Protein backbone atom coordinates (compact mmCIF):
# COMPACT_ATOMS: atom_id res chain seq x y z
CA UNK A 1 0.00 0.00 0.00
CA UNK A 2 1.10 3.54 -0.67
CA UNK A 3 2.31 5.69 2.22
CA UNK A 4 0.43 8.76 0.99
CA UNK A 5 -3.20 9.39 0.04
CA UNK A 6 -3.95 11.99 -2.65
CA UNK A 7 -6.68 14.32 -1.39
CA UNK A 8 -6.78 17.03 -4.04
CA UNK A 9 -5.30 18.68 -7.10
CA UNK A 10 -4.38 22.35 -7.36
CA UNK A 11 -6.30 23.57 -10.39
CA UNK A 12 -5.67 27.30 -10.26
CA UNK A 13 -4.76 30.32 -8.20
CA UNK A 14 -7.31 32.35 -6.26
CA UNK A 15 -6.85 36.07 -5.72
CA UNK A 16 -3.54 37.89 -5.67
CA UNK A 17 -2.07 36.77 -2.33
CA UNK A 18 -1.11 33.19 -3.18
CA UNK A 19 -4.27 31.27 -2.39
CA UNK A 20 -4.77 28.01 -4.27
CA UNK A 21 -7.97 26.65 -5.78
CA UNK A 22 -8.12 22.90 -5.15
CA UNK A 23 -10.28 20.21 -6.73
CA UNK A 24 -10.97 17.75 -3.88
CA UNK A 25 -10.34 14.06 -4.52
CA UNK A 26 -12.12 12.92 -1.38
CA UNK A 27 -15.74 12.00 -0.76
CA UNK A 28 -16.09 14.64 1.98
CA UNK A 29 -14.89 18.14 1.14
CA UNK A 30 -15.25 19.15 4.81
CA UNK A 31 -12.16 17.07 5.66
CA UNK A 32 -10.05 19.90 4.27
CA UNK A 33 -11.07 22.09 7.22
CA UNK A 34 -9.32 19.65 9.56
CA UNK A 35 -6.02 19.53 7.65
CA UNK A 36 -3.05 21.26 9.27
CA UNK A 37 -0.56 20.30 6.57
CA UNK A 38 -0.25 18.50 3.22
CA UNK A 39 2.54 17.14 1.08
CA UNK A 40 3.19 18.65 -2.34
CA UNK A 41 5.69 16.64 -4.38
CA UNK A 42 6.88 15.01 -1.16
CA UNK A 43 7.49 18.29 0.69
CA UNK A 44 5.45 19.04 3.81
CA UNK A 45 3.52 22.34 3.58
CA UNK A 46 1.62 23.97 6.45
CA UNK A 47 -1.93 25.12 5.78
CA UNK A 48 -2.72 28.56 7.21
CA UNK A 49 -6.25 28.97 5.83
CA UNK A 50 -9.08 27.01 4.26
CA UNK A 51 -12.37 28.08 2.69
CA UNK A 52 -14.95 25.90 0.99
CA UNK A 53 -16.35 27.34 -2.21
CA UNK A 54 -19.08 25.38 -3.98
CA UNK A 55 -17.37 22.07 -4.82
CA UNK A 56 -13.84 23.47 -4.59
CA UNK A 57 -11.46 24.32 -1.75
CA UNK A 58 -9.46 27.53 -1.41
CA UNK A 59 -6.25 26.88 0.54
CA UNK A 60 -3.66 29.25 1.89
CA UNK A 61 -0.30 27.54 2.32
CA UNK A 62 2.57 28.97 4.33
CA UNK A 63 5.25 30.49 2.09
CA UNK A 64 3.01 30.99 -0.94
CA UNK A 65 2.31 34.73 -0.79
CA UNK A 66 1.90 35.84 -4.40
CA UNK A 67 0.00 34.85 -7.51
CA UNK A 68 3.34 34.17 -9.23
CA UNK A 69 4.41 31.73 -6.52
CA UNK A 70 0.94 30.12 -6.53
CA UNK A 71 1.13 29.55 -10.29
CA UNK A 72 4.16 27.29 -9.72
CA UNK A 73 1.84 24.84 -7.92
CA UNK A 74 -0.89 24.68 -10.56
CA UNK A 75 -1.57 21.06 -11.57
CA UNK A 76 0.21 19.56 -8.56
CA UNK A 77 -1.39 17.11 -6.16
CA UNK A 78 -1.95 17.41 -2.42
CA UNK A 79 -1.28 14.33 -0.31
CA UNK A 80 -1.58 13.33 3.33
CA UNK A 81 0.38 10.59 5.03
CA UNK A 82 -1.58 7.39 5.55
CA UNK A 83 -1.27 7.67 9.34
CA UNK A 84 -2.83 11.15 9.20
CA UNK A 85 -5.60 10.13 6.82
CA UNK A 86 -9.15 9.76 8.06
CA UNK A 87 -9.84 6.39 9.68
CA UNK A 88 -12.26 4.38 7.56
CA UNK A 89 -15.03 2.13 8.80
CA UNK A 90 -14.57 -1.59 8.30
CA UNK A 91 -15.43 -2.54 4.73
CA UNK A 92 -14.46 0.89 3.33
CA UNK A 93 -11.26 1.50 1.41
CA UNK A 94 -9.24 4.32 -0.06
CA UNK A 95 -9.51 4.46 -3.84
CA UNK A 96 -5.70 4.37 -4.06
CA UNK A 97 -5.84 0.93 -2.41
CA UNK A 98 -8.54 -0.39 -4.77
CA UNK A 99 -7.03 0.78 -8.07
CA UNK A 100 -4.67 -1.88 -9.38
CA UNK A 101 -6.35 -4.77 -7.54
CA UNK A 102 -6.76 -7.99 -9.50
CA UNK A 103 -10.40 -9.01 -9.97
CA UNK A 104 -11.27 -12.71 -9.97
CA UNK A 105 -14.50 -14.57 -9.43
CA UNK A 106 -15.24 -17.37 -6.95
CA UNK A 107 -14.18 -19.92 -9.55
CA UNK A 108 -10.78 -18.26 -10.09
CA UNK A 109 -11.56 -16.63 -13.46
CA UNK A 110 -9.40 -13.51 -13.89
CA UNK A 111 -11.22 -10.46 -15.30
CA UNK A 112 -8.46 -7.86 -15.12
CA UNK A 113 -7.38 -5.09 -12.79
CA UNK A 114 -9.31 -2.12 -11.47
CA UNK A 115 -8.23 0.94 -13.43
CA UNK A 116 -10.68 3.44 -11.98
CA UNK A 117 -13.44 3.84 -9.41
CA UNK A 118 -16.47 5.72 -10.72
CA UNK A 119 -18.80 7.40 -8.24
CA UNK A 120 -22.54 7.25 -8.93
CA UNK A 121 -25.50 8.34 -6.83
CA UNK A 122 -26.28 4.81 -5.66
CA UNK A 123 -22.89 3.09 -5.43
CA UNK A 124 -19.36 3.09 -6.74
CA UNK A 125 -18.56 1.23 -9.94
CA UNK A 126 -15.22 -0.49 -10.57
CA UNK A 127 -13.84 -0.10 -14.10
CA UNK A 128 -11.96 -3.31 -14.87
CA UNK A 129 -9.43 -3.53 -17.69
CA UNK A 130 -8.17 -6.90 -18.83
CA UNK A 131 -8.68 -8.77 -22.10
CA UNK A 132 -11.97 -6.87 -22.16
CA UNK A 133 -13.29 -3.92 -20.20
CA UNK A 134 -15.98 -4.45 -17.61
CA UNK A 135 -17.91 -2.20 -15.22
CA UNK A 136 -18.70 -3.86 -11.90
CA UNK A 137 -21.09 -2.35 -9.36
CA UNK A 138 -19.37 -2.16 -5.97
CA UNK A 139 -22.30 -3.71 -4.12
CA UNK A 140 -22.48 -6.47 -1.55
CA UNK A 141 -24.19 -9.08 -3.73
CA UNK A 142 -21.56 -8.73 -6.51
CA UNK A 143 -18.31 -7.96 -4.65
CA UNK A 144 -17.75 -10.79 -2.19
CA UNK A 145 -14.34 -9.96 -0.73
CA UNK A 146 -11.85 -7.11 -0.90
CA UNK A 147 -8.29 -7.84 0.22
CA UNK A 148 -6.19 -4.72 -0.29
CA UNK A 149 -3.15 -6.40 1.28
CA UNK A 150 -3.21 -9.11 -1.42
CA UNK A 151 -4.41 -6.57 -4.02
CA UNK A 152 -7.30 -8.90 -4.87
CA UNK A 153 -11.06 -8.54 -5.17
CA UNK A 154 -13.32 -11.57 -5.45
CA UNK A 155 -16.67 -11.20 -7.20
CA UNK A 156 -19.56 -13.46 -8.11
CA UNK A 157 -19.22 -14.91 -11.62
CA UNK A 158 -20.54 -12.33 -14.09
CA UNK A 159 -23.12 -14.71 -15.58
CA UNK A 160 -24.83 -15.05 -12.16
CA UNK A 161 -25.59 -11.34 -11.76
CA UNK A 162 -28.90 -11.50 -13.58
Swiss-Prot record:
Q: What does this protein do?
A: An accessory protein needed during the final step in the assembly of 30S ribosomal subunit, possibly for assembly of the head region. Essential for efficient processing of 16S rRNA. May be needed both before and after RbfA during the maturation of 16S rRNA. It has affinity for free ribosomal 30S subunits but not for 70S ribosomes.
Q: InterPro entries, from UniProt?
A: PRC_barrel-like_sf, PRC_RimM, RimM, RimM_N, RimM_N_sf, Transl_B-barrel_sf
- Output this protein's name: Ribosome maturation factor RimM
Which residues belong to any copy of the PRC barrel domain? 89-161
A molecular function (GO) term: ribosome binding
Question: What does the domain comment read?
Answer: The PRC barrel domain binds ribosomal protein uS19.
Assembly and partners are described as: Binds ribosomal protein uS19.
- What GO biological process terms are annotated to this protein in UniProt? ribosomal small subunit biogenesis; rRNA processing
**HAMAP family listed in its UniProt record:** Ribosome_mat_RimM
**Family indicated by similarity:** Belongs to the RimM family.
Q: Can you tell which superkingdom this protein's organism belongs to?
A: Bacteria
Entry keyword set: Chaperone, Cytoplasm, Ribosome biogenesis, rRNA processing
- State the GO CC annotations: cytoplasm; ribosome
Q: Where in the cell is it found?
A: Cytoplasm
Amino acid sequence: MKDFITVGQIINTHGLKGELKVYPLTDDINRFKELKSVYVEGILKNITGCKLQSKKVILKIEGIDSIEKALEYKGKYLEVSRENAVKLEEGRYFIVDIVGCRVIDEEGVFYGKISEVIHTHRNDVYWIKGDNELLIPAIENVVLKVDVEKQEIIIKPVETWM
